[in-house]
Amino acid sequence: MIFHCEVDKIVDQLQQLMQVYDLAALRDYWSYLERRLFSRLEDIYRPTIHKLKTSLFRFYLVYTIQTNRNDKAQEFFAKQATELQNQAEWKDWFVLPFLPSPDTNPTFATYFSRQWADTFIVSLHNFLSVLFQCMPVPVILNFDAECRRTNQVQEENEVLRQKLFALQAEIHRLKKEEQQPEEEEALVQHKLPPYVSNMDRLGDSELAMVCSQRNASLSQSPRVGFLSSLLPQSKKSPSRLSPAQGPPQAQSSAKKESFGGQGTKGKDPTSGAKDGKGLLSGLATGESGWSQHRQRRLQDHGKERKELFSTTTSQCAEKKPEASGPEAEPCPELHTEPVEPLTRTSLAGPEGGGVRPEQPFIVLGQEEYGEHHSSIMHCRVDCSGRRVASLDVDGVIKVWSFNPIMQTKASSISKSPLLSLEWATKRDRLLLLGSGVGTVRLYDTEAKKNLCEININDDMPRILSLACSPNGASFVCSAAAPSLTSQVDFSAPDIGSKGMNQVPGRLLLWDTKTMKQQLQFSLDPEPIAINCTAFNHNGNLLVTGAADGVIRLFDMQQHECAMSWRAHYGEVYSVEFSYDENTVYSIGEDGKFIQWNIHKSGLKVSEYSLPSDATGPFVLSGYSGYKQVQVPRGRLFAFDSEGNYMLTCSATGGVIYKLGGDEKVLESCLSLGGHRAPVVTVDWSTAMDCGTCLTASMDGKIKLTTLLAHKA
């Protein structure tokens, strides 16, 4: 309806201009329609537009003749002659103002009819109507519709997210139900007989009598293998059991009695049960205060004990011929452990442990980038989350995208060894590459060429770390003297004592636009190699980790060290600001993952021990004693968008831990897996709707895992 109103207004406006003989306005209005509307159409519609324009001008000429305004007709040809004289369809129309009765002329009679005029108006109206319906709405006018559509898509995504997690919980429940029959079948011999379940209702003397008979039976049985050493012997009769404690202790007693029955291989367990029954009966008759009902109950208990011993002995006897030697394997039913309830997996076993009932992330997919053929050193996502830059030990740089498909955008091989890599912040098409010969190169990933190469320092040729300020105006560069140990050693020598690779170094600030050095930071107490650097969100703070185990926090407005403290025994391998930027996290050569308060120098917030495959040095073993050892160079950990979870390296893939807990060990939430070689660097991009985890390993493989976060 809105489109029809607009079309009606356009047609009415054209007719009004013709009625007042405003040829200039008519031409301008049609030119406006051509520029704003008709120019967006395909070329196949150009003949139609030209015919409509010709008919519009003829309609104007006919109107001037019908209203006896020949002067306006002559004015039309005077102004339009240069445009129309070369067009064949206008060749006969130049005589129109001079004909006495043009409506009777066979050439023009059709145009003076009412039918032709109505047909033209309807054709113009229909053409504009179809054009408005098919033409895309301008972006500014489509804002409200886009907002509504975006909100609708977000609501649908949230509904699908909840359905996905609900299905995951249902799958977990069904798997648990499938495992229960197997567990019950495996634990059938641990089922408590009635006399044990009712033991808490027996008197103290009855309980002591049952326990004494059990001990007597165990004392007469020879010990079998290591299993007997694991069964403690009771030295005194237990006291009356409370109702709350009855079932667990009763179950333990049942297990011990079963093992005791199993140990009597050379004797008939039936006779032992009969002796027990006689003993129970004798004690029952000798007690003057017992009732007849209590005596019958004890006799029933004796029968049940007899059945229990008989069943246990017969089952073990079936297994006995298969065993070789005196140390026969006991019945599996007797030592089957019940399945423990689901618990959180601790750091001691990130690959094992139970599955959490509700995972914080769902793995939507995992892809592999395999265009590197040697160990990866760095793998970083740009700030837009669309491209990845990866660098291996052979100096091969790959820039590739993964959305919607994985595709290599640029590739380069460096003649000199490369040690560091960093994306530029403002112009995210640029890469900073630090070499092992004292140079930093600025590489354009779209033009696929080096823009410039600057010489940092000849005395300190190793560019260990690069960090670009978030404002894009500058970057810091860590230069160090030659290493005491090689970066990648194929003979795998002894790594030596921690912190032995302490060499002099410098921390420099460079201008991004001019590519000139601005200043050199002071490194107290002495110049030392800086292994890792990181800015906060606005670039006002810079945190560094050095080979001497010291973390230094620099004020980038004053260009001085605000505080420093010894953080690790050995080198600091990786350091990052926390999500709220009130603390920093670090990983060191000592295998510690520590959180530090930046408002109080050296104040430790938390400390955790990480596995060696998460901190390095990383070792890849091969045939004939071949070993490849790589010292950490890239980022060893990365955070999610809210800083609640951390991604680290491992021998088989990335591992995600939950942060902020009160436990003394980190809680492992998800193991990404997928690698056959140790992972040496990670990155976590949250620029897109779904999180993207990157894990790069020593065999040159890079795994890209897409995660969907569970929103509470």
UniProtKB/Swiss-Prot annotation:
WD repeats lie at residues 371-410, 413-453, 480-520, 525-564, 567-606, 629-667, 674-712. InterPro entries: ARMC9_CTLH-like_dom, WD40/YVTN_repeat-like_dom_sf, WD40_repeat_dom_sf, WD40_rpt, WDR91. GO terms for biological process: early endosome to late endosome transport; negative regulation of phosphatidylinositol 3-kinase/protein kinase B signal transduction. Residues 230-336 are annotated as: Disordered. Residues 148-180 form a coiled coil. Keywords: Coiled coil, Endosome, Membrane, Phosphoprotein, Repeat, WD repeat. The keyword Phosphoprotein applies. GO terms for molecular function: phosphatidylinositol 3-kinase inhibitor activity. GO terms for cellular component: cytosol; early endosome membrane; endosome membrane; late endosome membrane. It is found in: Early endosome membrane; Late endosome membrane. Residues 230-243 have a biased composition (Low complexity). Its main location: membrane. Belongs to the WD repeat WDR91 family. This is WD repeat-containing protein 91. It comes from Pongo abelii (Sumatran orangutan). The lineage of its organism: Eukaryota, Metazoa, Chordata, Craniata, Vertebrata.
